[in-house]
Amino acid sequence: MNLRILRASLFVTVISLLTLSFGLVQLRARASASPQTDQESAEKSLRAFHEVASVLTSPRCLNCHVPDDGPLQGDDDHPHIMNVKRGADGKGSAALRCFACHQTQNAAVLHGPPGALEWQLPPPRAPMAWKGLSTGELCRTLKDPSKNGNRSLQDLIVHMDTSLVRWAWNPGPGRTLPPLSHDEFVSRLKEWIDTGAACPN
């Protein structure tokens, strides 16, 4: 009887030790895997944002996202003719409103006035200006509600589907397109957000 009890006791002890060992192995595996997973997410996030930035710094976006009071024009980013100004609401000065030339559709002639609904610059209260910024500075500006029109990251996704933003992929004759399609751009934006919205240094 004593031998049976001893064997049973030994069996229970062995099982307990094996269970404990297995638990320790799992904990160590999780501890070693977590930093790697976080690092991989950060790397994916940074790669995605670099692609997002390639669109945001193309002439179709950059010409209106300027720190100065007047927009730019063309693929060479030259100052807008007629001394156009941002105005108090981003839609031009009182004397020369944007809609005076920019209608809801592009003009059919080469380099004619482009058009889309709500044609305007970002207003002075939230100029969303990133011309001249590094990729990291652009990233942090885009995430900052005080600089991005008081938008959350999810709001940015919605904003990128507006007719004015979509115009960049239908800019009219004589203007180059952004380096990604609109679908690719939005996909990279979502990927950047879903993987932590990491910013380059």
What function would you assign to each model-found segment?
Residues 1-53, 73, 84-89, 108-201:
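N-terminal export/targeting leaders of redox proteins
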Residues 44-45, 80-81, 101:
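Short amphipathic alpha-helical surface micro-motifs
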Residues 47, 59, 93-96, 184:
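Short, well-structured alpha-helical interface segments that form or flank functional binding sites
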Residues 57-91:
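N-terminal, post-signal-peptide region of Sec/Tat-exported proteins
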Residues 59-68, 95-105, 189:
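The canonical Cys-X-X-Cys-His
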